């Protein structure tokens, strides 16, 4: 089954963004519809159990909550940082407000639905795997088939866009390979990692720690990008300069590298909140290094520090 899924995802990615776009558009409606139905089934079948469990639970805004949001941001920050991999294919002039609205509508409903369903199912049955609950305990073949379809669509839509496209671009840039060869290589390498083992109950704690760990690096990268774009460049970019290999962006901006290292080191001390902890130190260090480092002089073109 995993081999078939992997082959389908690679084939879809090879066809390029036009095929991915239509697959995503169709699947998102289907997935939201299934999630709404799942929520309805859980609420009607386990309403008394859910009420009994939650009646004695006090909510918390403490470390468990913020650690969970760190894991969430760690997963989605890869997509945030690589948003240009997708937006570069947009042919229409989409304003920031419209783009933000599209991202919000596309991500939040599905994410909240899945989190809510997982929470309710765990509270009612003690099993934290909604897929297993729906496919084995509901006693409905229709619901089992629906659950399996949901898994298939969710895997394909998430993995193709988030996990194949960004590394494929990296391979293309680093080794000068074609898009087709890059996507096939990413697909083969991702299968070698055996991600289906990472989501088992035995691996849950380790996976969460791994997510928090790489958030210690993705948070600083995001901070550098945000400070550079919103504060230093006042949301104005010269695309000709960015794509000119002999232009002002030639070489390595050591101010950014040092800032990312500083932010990563700071976040390691509070691993559960790594993404949040890294933002301010990274942003502050990057701002002052861009202002003072001689080696960053060429990168100041178009910023508030330009001579």
Language-model segment annotations:
Residues 1, 88-93, 127, 160-187, ...:
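Helix-loop-helix connectors at the membrane interface of multi-pass transporters/channels
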Residues 1-4, 17-27, 130-143, 173-185, ...:
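Transmembrane helix-loop boundary segments of multi-pass membrane transporters
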Residues 1-15, 29-39, 68-83, 108-109, ...:
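Transmembrane alpha-helical segments of multi-pass small-molecule transport proteins
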Residues 5-42, 101-106, 210-214, 276-284:
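Membrane-interface loop-to-helix entry segments
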Residues 6-27, 85-91, 160-163, 169-174, ...:
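Membrane-water interface regions at transmembrane-helix termini and the short interhelical loops
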Residues 29-55, 73-77, 118-124, 223-236, ...:
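Hydrophobic alpha-helical segments and their helix-loop junctions in multi-pass secondary transporters
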Residues 39-44, 55-117, 141-161, 218, ...:
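Hydrophobic, membrane-embedded alpha-helices of multi-pass small-molecule transporters
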Residues 221-285, 296-307:
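C-terminal membrane-solvent junction of multi-pass transporters and transport-like membrane proteins
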